Amino acid sequence: GLPVCGETCFGGTCNTPGCTCSYPICTRN
């Protein structure tokens, strides 16, 4: 939820392990 993973998820998925989509960016926890 807090740190940004340096990835966007406009497609709805995140490729970075441990990261989830908090549209439109990927976050970790």
Swiss-Prot record:
Name recorded for this polypeptide: Cyclotide vibi-B
Functional description taken from the UniProt entry: Probably participates in a plant defense mechanism.
Keyword Metal-binding: no
One of the protein's GO biological processes: defense response
Disulfide topology: 5-19, 9-21, 14-26
Entry keyword set: Disulfide bond, Knottin, Plant defense
InterPro entries named among the record's database cross-references: Cyclotide, Cyclotide_moebius_CS, Cyclotide_sf
Pfam families, alphabetized: Cyclotide
